[in-house]
Amino acid sequence: LFGMGPALAAVAMAVNAEIPVDVIRHTLKTFKGVEHRIEFVREVHGVRFINDSKGTNVDSTLKAIATMDRPTTIILGGSTKHSDYAPLAKAMVESPYIEGAVVIGATTPEITPALDAAGFTDYRLETDFKQAVVAAQSMTRRGGNVLLSPACASFDMFSCFEERGDTFKQIVNELQ
């Protein structure tokens, strides 16, 4: 579970500060998580949409992939940080849950060779963000996830990762 480490650290600090256990329990049960970080948006026709727009580098996206527990289509790409996408492509091939990808943005020429070299072939290229979300939905079977975790900065299409995440949520909330 993503965030388990920080949650356990918070519990330890709360216990050390002598916060009542019932208050700690209530806080853990009601905490909704951090916006744009493995954030559940909505389920549409049996497909769950997860916003990880904060996944602006390969390491963050690897961590997001590790939290997936059902068939997942990932949306990758954005503006370049001149990253090595080989570890990401390898993790996608090795993951029992990453079944497809939609690649968008200025980093498409950097990401697709890494996917090809790793043998990850179930991906589509899109140039429009909304179309990328729609394509990911169409690639994902009922009971699966669409994960926006780009492994890239957002500056080719958006002013910041928050704008990208908010746009993702808006598109998802408009899906029928």
Predicted stretch roles:
Residues 1-98:
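Nucleotide phosphate-binding/pyrophosphate-handling subdomain across enzymes
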Residues 17, 54, 122-125, 157:
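A structural signal for short, well-ordered beta-strand elements
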Residues 21, 58, 85, 108, ...:
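Residues at or immediately preceding the N-termini of alpha-helices
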Residues 23, 60, 110-113, 157:
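Phosphate- and divalent-cation-binding pockets in alpha/beta enzyme and binding domains
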Residues 76, 147-151:
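Short beta-strands and strand-loop turn motifs
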Residues 82, 108-111, 153-156:
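Short, active-site-adjacent cap segments at secondary-structure transitions
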Residues 86-144:
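C-terminal helical cap/extension that packs against the catalytic core
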Residues 151-176:
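Glycine/aspartate-rich loop-and-adjacent alpha/beta segment that forms the canonical ThDP
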